[in-house]
Structures are given as C-alpha cells and as structure tokens.
C-alpha cells in the first residue's frame, strides 16, 4: 500500500513540476510542491475507489486552478498521473497556441515595443527601407539632378524620351483666313475649276476677298504673262525645295520698305502662275507648301500693315488702280534682280 502511495506521489509531483524534475531544477520548490501536504489524503481516496480527482484540491471536478499558482506554473494540461482515472486538474487550463509548438508567444509588453518601432511614415513605407536617423538618411535629389541623370537616354535631337514635342504656335484668325484664301486661289488656278466648298469662320469676308482676288489676279497674269514666264524659267522650280526657296525672293519684294495692295496681289498672282506650272510637271503636292510660304511672308512680316488696312476687308475695298500698276512694276523689278531676268523684262516694266 505504501509503495503504491509513494509512486502516486512521485508521479503527481513530476507532472506538476515539483521537486525532483532532474538536473537544472536546483532543488527549488515549484508551486506543485505545495500539494505534498495532501498527497496521502488523495492517494487514500483513490485506493478507496470512490473519490474524484477534483477532491485532491478540495473542490469540485470543474473547479478552476488555485489562485496561488504563479505565472511560471502555467503549463498545458498533461495526461493523468499513473494510477489516476481523470486528467490532472491541478494544471493550468490549456491556452490556444497561435505559433508552432516549439515557439512561445512573447508577453504583450514585449510585443508592443517592436510594433512601435515598425511604424513608418507613408513616404518611408513606399520607399521600402527601414526608418533611419535623420543624419543618416540620403538627401532628396533636386528635380534638375533627376532630369540630368535621365539625359543619358536622350534622343538624337537632344530631347528626353518622355518629353512631348513642343506645341505648334497657335494660328491667329488673320493667318488662318489668309492661308485659306491664298491656298484656295492657287488650287483653283492649277486645276482650272472653282472650289464651291464653304469658307471658314469668316465666310462672308473670305468669300468676297476670294472673288476680288480672282478678278484682279487673273488680270495681272494676263497682262504680265511674258514676264512671269521669264521669271519662272530663271527660277527653274521643279520640286518642293525649289518652292521653299521662293521665300527669299518674296521677302526681297518688300526690301525697300514699301507695302501696298498692288505688291501683295502681284505676289499672289505670281504664286498662282507657279501653281499652274507645278500642275503640268505632276507636282501638285507642292501647291499647299507654296501657299504656306506666301502666307508666311505676308502675315509674319507685314502683320502691322495688314491690321492697319483692316485685313481682307481693306483688300476688297481697294480701288486705287494706279497703286495696283505701280505695285506690279516694283514686284517685277524685284524678281528681275533676283532671278536675273534679261533686257526684255527690263523694257517691259520701264
């Protein structure tokens, strides 16, 4: 009987973490050792056969662990000791494990400190690196330095790959209206048919200006066809590059500082004469660049004068016939000087 009691006491003491656990215990008394005083009574009740394991503590089977248990005694419930019929209720109720069995959850106060250290600002979180002291953080590169670093991937024209092409200069109403009138007149002269499409925003004014240009321009070409042919022969216009070179001759027309409607209408009339030539050599695609060159010379260099004359409204109201003839002579002289027209042209415009 005593041997059985002794085995039960040793088994219970070992499972409860009492003395005699082995090396490293140092002989220290564990909380489970406090039950030694009741070992004989518990063993006696087991031998009788009617006692519940819960009576060992002096309470019911569902009683909670004694309040005297220290935090170090909190352990997972173990199987019943040798000779016991029910689980050992003296062990602390099992706690849910959120980690692997080999790991132990850190206390709450130990977990709060790393969590506080891990808090980063949105910028640091996006950058993907741990926060550093201000003295060690790299300085933010200026915008100009970032642009300079990407300069290694520039295109052949020196612009950045992501740089959009510069926006074209917005064409004002005077330029748009002038280009529409001159371009339509040159196309009509090349094809020999009137364009019946409606004009742009300044429809009424543009339509009247185009009608006036047809009447005056056609007369200039008839009266000075020989001179125009001589100048065209000297200029030897065959392609778009030759058309672009006409800008130099057009600018020379106004080199003396005199501007009037006679010179302007003669310049446009000669452009129509060139457009007919481009049609005959199958270079109709050059007619539009020719119209743009004439418009550029007139609007870009003579804008102030055109504005003072009220633009194409002033052209429609132009009635000074003598000014028209005087302008024609000056234009022919200018073309003769640049294109090298011979004595026949000089006699014509004397």
From Swiss-Prot:
<dbReference type="GO" id="GO:0005829">
    <property type="term" value="C:cytosol"/>
</dbReference>
<keyword id="KW-0597">Phosphoprotein</keyword>
<keyword id="KW-0496">Mitochondrion</keyword>
<dbReference type="GO" id="GO:0008630">
    <property type="term" value="P:intrinsic apoptotic signaling pathway in response to DNA damage"/>
</dbReference>
<dbReference type="InterPro" id="IPR013281">
    <property type="entry name" value="Apop_reg_Mc1"/>
</dbReference>
<dbReference type="GO" id="GO:0016020">
    <property type="term" value="C:membrane"/>
</dbReference>
<comment type="subunit">
    <text>Interacts with HIF3A (via C-terminus domain). Interacts with BAD, BOK, BIK and BMF. Interacts with PMAIP1. Interacts with BBC3. Isoform 1 interacts with BAX, BAK1 and TPT1. Heterodimer of isoform 1 and isoform 2. Homodimers of isoform 1 or isoform 2 are not detected. Isoform 2 does not interact with pro-apoptotic BCL2-related proteins. Interacts with RTL10/BOP. Interacts with BCL2L11; may sequester BCL2L11 to prevent its pro-apoptotic activity. Interacts with GIMAP5 and HSPA8/HSC70; the interaction between HSPA8 and MCL1 is impaired in the absence of GIMAP5.</text>
</comment>
<dbReference type="GO" id="GO:0005634">
    <property type="term" value="C:nucleus"/>
</dbReference>
<keyword id="KW-0053">Apoptosis</keyword>
<feature type="cross-link" description="Glycyl lysine isopeptide (Lys-Gly) (interchain with G-Cter in ubiquitin)">
    <location>
        <position position="136"/>
    </location>
</feature>
<feature type="site" description="Cleavage; by caspase-3">
    <location>
        <begin position="157"/>
        <end position="158"/>
    </location>
</feature>
<comment type="function">
    <text>Involved in the regulation of apoptosis versus cell survival, and in the maintenance of viability but not of proliferation. Mediates its effects by interactions with a number of other regulators of apoptosis. Isoform 1 inhibits apoptosis. Isoform 2 promotes apoptosis.</text>
</comment>
<dbReference type="GO" id="GO:0008053">
    <property type="term" value="P:mitochondrial fusion"/>
</dbReference>
<dbReference type="GO" id="GO:0005739">
    <property type="term" value="C:mitochondrion"/>
</dbReference>
<feature type="cross-link" description="Glycyl lysine isopeptide (Lys-Gly) (interchain with G-Cter in ubiquitin)">
    <location>
        <position position="40"/>
    </location>
</feature>
<feature type="compositionally biased region" description="Polar residues">
    <location>
        <begin position="150"/>
        <end position="161"/>
    </location>
</feature>
<dbReference type="GO" id="GO:2000811">
    <property type="term" value="P:negative regulation of anoikis"/>
</dbReference>
<keyword id="KW-0539">Nucleus</keyword>
<feature type="short sequence motif" description="BH1">
    <location>
        <begin position="252"/>
        <end position="272"/>
    </location>
</feature>
<dbReference type="InterPro" id="IPR002475">
    <property type="entry name" value="Bcl2-like"/>
</dbReference>
<feature type="modified residue" description="Phosphoserine">
    <location>
        <position position="162"/>
    </location>
</feature>
<comment type="similarity">
    <text>Belongs to the Bcl-2 family.</text>
</comment>
<dbReference type="GO" id="GO:0043065">
    <property type="term" value="P:positive regulation of apoptotic process"/>
</dbReference>
<keyword id="KW-1133">Transmembrane helix</keyword>
<dbReference type="InterPro" id="IPR036834">
    <property type="entry name" value="Bcl-2-like_sf"/>
</dbReference>
<dbReference type="GO" id="GO:0019725">
    <property type="term" value="P:cellular homeostasis"/>
</dbReference>
<dbReference type="GO" id="GO:0005654">
    <property type="term" value="C:nucleoplasm"/>
</dbReference>
<feature type="region of interest" description="PEST-like">
    <location>
        <begin position="104"/>
        <end position="175"/>
    </location>
</feature>
<feature type="transmembrane region" description="Helical">
    <location>
        <begin position="328"/>
        <end position="348"/>
    </location>
</feature>
<feature type="site" description="Cleavage; by caspase-3">
    <location>
        <begin position="127"/>
        <end position="128"/>
    </location>
</feature>
<keyword id="KW-1017">Isopeptide bond</keyword>
<feature type="short sequence motif" description="BH3">
    <location>
        <begin position="209"/>
        <end position="223"/>
    </location>
</feature>
<dbReference type="GO" id="GO:1903378">
    <property type="term" value="P:positive regulation of oxidative stress-induced neuron intrinsic apoptotic signaling pathway"/>
</dbReference>
<dbReference type="GO" id="GO:0015267">
    <property type="term" value="F:channel activity"/>
</dbReference>
<feature type="cross-link" description="Glycyl lysine isopeptide (Lys-Gly) (interchain with G-Cter in ubiquitin)">
    <location>
        <position position="194"/>
    </location>
</feature>
<protein>
    <recommendedName>
        <fullName>Induced myeloid leukemia cell differentiation protein Mcl-1</fullName>
    </recommendedName>
</protein>
<keyword id="KW-0221">Differentiation</keyword>
<feature type="cross-link" description="Glycyl lysine isopeptide (Lys-Gly) (interchain with G-Cter in ubiquitin)">
    <location>
        <position position="5"/>
    </location>
</feature>
<feature type="modified residue" description="Phosphoserine">
    <location>
        <position position="121"/>
    </location>
</feature>
<dbReference type="GO" id="GO:0043066">
    <property type="term" value="P:negative regulation of apoptotic process"/>
</dbReference>
<dbReference type="GO" id="GO:0034097">
    <property type="term" value="P:response to cytokine"/>
</dbReference>
<dbReference type="GO" id="GO:0051434">
    <property type="term" value="F:BH3 domain binding"/>
</dbReference>
